[in-house]
C-alpha cells in the first residue's frame, strides 16, 4: 500500500476516533494515540515513518501559532513568574533528574543521559491545548499550564541541541552552553516580535480574505524557518512570540468581520487535522522503534520505562510543592507579591505534564552516528523510553485529569468570566449609543434611528441587570435558553422556506447561498 493511501486511512481513522472520544467525553489525544498504536500493528499496513523535520517544520509552526494567537497576553503577564519558573527552572530540574536516574540505574553515559533528559523535560503545547480545551479548569490553571507548554519547548530544545552537540563532538563548556542558551532563546523571542511588527504594513493592505488566510498560514512557516535555518535561534519561541503579537494586533489591522470569521474557521479545521494526524502518527511509531531493541528483554524495557515515567512525575510533584514555598523570597527580590496557588491547583498542575510530538521529534532527530563515525550510544533505547513517556502521560493523565478535577472540586470561573463578558458588552453598547447621537441621520428614517436606539438601550438594561446579579440569574438563564430555542425554530423554518424556493427553481444558487449564510451567522450567534 502506498503512502498516500495509508495517509487517507489514517485521516479517516483519526476523524472516527475523535468522534468516539467526543461521544465518551474524554480528551481525544488519548483515543488517537491508542488508535495509532493499534493501526501500527495491522498486518499489511505500512507504518508511516515521521522524519523529525516534518514535525518541526510542517506540524509545529501552525499549531504553535494558533495556540499563541488565542492566548491572553494579559493573563500570561499576570502569571509570568510561575510560567517563567516552569518554562526554565522545571525544564532544567527535570532534565537533571532524568539524567541522574538513567545514568545510575540504567547505566547510560552522562552526556547521553542529558540528551534523554532534554528530550523529555518540556511538556507538549499541542497535548496541553487539546486536553485542557475539553476540561473545565480554573483560568489560572489553564493559563499557567498552557503558558508553560508554549515556552518550555524552546528551553528544552535549546538544552537538547547543546546536549547532542556534547555527545557528538565530545566537548562541552558550561559557559558556552549558558551563553548559547540565552542567545538562542532570547533571540527567538525577539525575532518573533520584530517580524510581527515588520509585517503589519502587509496585513493592513490585504483586503481579500482568501489571501489573508493564506498569508496567515505562510508567515508562521516563514518565521520558523527564518529563525531556525537562517539566524539559528529558537524557531519555537519565535513562532510563539509572533503568534502572541499577532493575536493582540489582529482585530485592529484587519477589521473585516467576515474575513475574521473565515480565518478562525480555517484555523480550527487545520489545527484539528494536524493534531489528529500527529497523535495517530505518534501511536504508530512503536512497531518501528521496537525493531532496534533486540538486545533488551521485555522486562528490562518495561522497568526502564516505568523508572523514567516515575521520575517525570516525581520531579513535577516536587517542583510544584517545594518551589512555591520560596514565593516570599521572590516577592522581596522582585518587589512584587504573587498570590500562591491553592494546593488543589498545584496538585492538578503536577498531574498535567503531558509529553507529545516535540519530544518524539527530538528523539527521532538524534543523529545515528558520532563525529568519529561510531553509532550514537543507546539511540534506540532513547526512542523507546521517549515513546513510552509520551504514551503514559497522554493516556494516564488524559484519562484521569477529568475525574481529578471533579474530586478536587475545581471549577472554571464561569460566573466571573460572564461578568467580565457583560461588562465588555456594556462598554461597547455605551460607545455605540454615544456615536449614534453624533452621527448625521438625515439619510436614515427617524423611525429606524429610534428602533436602533431602543435596541441598544434594551441591551444596556440587560447587561446591567446581569452584572448586578453577578453573572447570570437562574431566571435570566431560563428565559435566554427558551428564547434561543424559540429563535432557532424560526430560523429553521426560514431555512426550509429558502430551500423549498430553491427546489422549485425560483431562486439562483448564488442568492440562496447569500441568504443561507446570513441565517447561518444568526444561528451561530445564538450558540455563543
Could you describe each region identified by the protein language model?
Residues 1-419, 430, 479, 499-528:
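Transmembrane helical cores of multi-pass secondary ion antiporters/exchangers
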